[in-house]
């Protein structure tokens, strides 16, 4: 039986999981295709031809010398989400680019709730005021930025 892999992420034109397997994942951040380790991707890649498009690869075979390797000059991608521009960075010692795209469904929820809050106040003819948000995932600051841009 073929393996059916689905991502639990909302649509975002600046991020895409292209393929995964052999303990790696192939992703597109804006126009930059990267390869990063993913220990839970134990299956075989499904779209082998796409892997040639990778221009940045995180090498973490030796944890002490974990680093990014590039094919040519590669600029860190800028990701756009509405009015927000997220500046990413390739950092040796970390496979992350400073943002977790899989959090986008949560950012969508934050934005949606801010809009519902404003509509609720308007329906009750109450003076506009800012909703209150407690951000419990503040590691990168992305959720806080989305919240601020949404009116929190």
Residue ranges of predicted features:
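Helix-loop module immediately N-terminal to the HCX5R catalytic loop
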Residues: 105-106, 112
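N-terminal accessory targeting/assembly segments
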Residues: 1-9
